[in-house]
Amino acid sequence: MGAERVCTKAPEITQDEAEIYSLTNMEGNIGIKGCEFKSWLFKFYQARSQVLLCGEVKNPYLLTSNKTTVKEQNACLTHPDRSAMAGLLL
């Protein structure tokens, strides 16, 4: 399958760290939760609310199980502590 990415389980994110945000695109609503580094490419899986973070330095995207991509520009969350992309596919 091409180049592999290094993936690790995402740390548990509490409500205090980030609230749940909703993004709307042509596929419908996507709920995203939490904040992480901009240099990560986030792959979201709905399997028992486990989130995989796949390292990718350039052009981070949100990938949903519906193969819907949302640009970082639309998905980036601004946070007092950290600014980044996030998430959990609800």
From Swiss-Prot:
It holds the Pfam family DUF5557. InterPro entries: DUF5557 (IPR040904). It comes from the Eukaryota. This is Uncharacterized protein encoded by LINC03043. It comes from Homo sapiens. The lineage of its organism: Eukaryota, Metazoa, Chordata, Craniata, Vertebrata. The gene is LINC03043.
